[in-house]
A protein has these predicted regions:
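Glycine-rich, phosphate-binding/catalytic loops in enzymes
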Residues: 45-46, 70-73, 97-99, 189-190, ...
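Residues at the C-termini of beta-strands that transition into short coil/loop
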Residues: 30-32, 81, 108, 214
Length: 237
């Protein structure tokens, strides 16, 4: 059997602490936390103009938090959306909440999608984060000039959610689908069966572009997701 080749994308234009204009409704600030898990760092996305949502505020690095505060001066963060509770995604929600008095939205605390104990205490998990608003699959979040649908995608973590920006047919994929690497699926909280089901779920959607929290956007979304599924099934055989 030929192993499936995933068409990885390694280009990534960024500079730390700068506000990149990506599309009419999407901007991004990259945190200075490069690693083997985060690629060049956590890409914190800003949806909208004026009254905005922040997707995955990122790690608790003062430089990054200050950059977000400074770059968004004159704007108001009305929503903070968390794809999942890992230390490179959710902790910066706490200081940003203080600045703007914003509510956070997520599936639940770490291990929320799991029954057995153990998932709640794994390394790399953000155990502090509890969303102000718990969202479920299909929930709609209405902002000022933007609309987001919640897409529950357990696998990488049991509480992983993608956020679909309706106005641009775009999906913020967190760590569920990345362009430069496959996801780490580590038990007890990660689950391979859920992960493959969540990938198959994306194939049924009509999103045209993916914005992962690490690395650049993915435009050939269906083929990309199918390659991920095939790659995992090759390995499981």
């Amino acid at each position: 059997v030929m192993a499936t080749k995933i068409p990885f994308i390694y280009e990534y234009e960024y500079s730390y602490g700068a506000l990149e204009e990506l599309t009419p409704l999407i901007r991004r600030v990259t945190a200075p936390n490069p690693s083997g898990f985060t690629f060049h760092g956590t890409g914190t996305y800003i949806i909208g103009r004026g009254n905005v949502a922040v997707v995955d505020p990122g790690p608790l690095i003062e430089e990054h938090v200050k950059a977000l505060e400074n770059l968004l001066q004159g704007e108001t963060v009305t929503h903070i959306l968390i794809t999942h509770t890992h230390a490179d995604h959710s902790p910066a929600a706490a200081p940003l909440k203080k600045v703007w008095g914003t509510k956070t939205y997520g599936y639940g605390p770490h291990g929320a999608g799991k029954i057995e104990p153990g998932a709640q205490i794994e390394a790399g998990g953000d155990m502090e984060f509890i969303p102000d608003v718990e969202v479920r699959d299909g929930d709609i979040i209405e902002g000022d000039g933007w609309t987001v649908e919640c897409v529950y995608t357990p696998g990488h973590t049991s509480n992983h959610i993608c956020f679909s920006l309706k106005e641009e047919n775009a999906l913020f994929t967190g760590d569920h689908v990345m362009g430069w690497s496959t996801s780490v699926i580590g038990p007890p909280d990660g689950d391979m069966t859920s992960y493959i089901s969540s990938l198959e779920k994306l194939l049924l959607r009509d999103d045209e572009i993916y914005w992962p929290t690490h690395g650049t956007c993915i435009t050939d979304v269906k083929n990309f997701v199918q390659a991920f599924i095939d790659h995992r099934l090759d390995r499981e055989r």
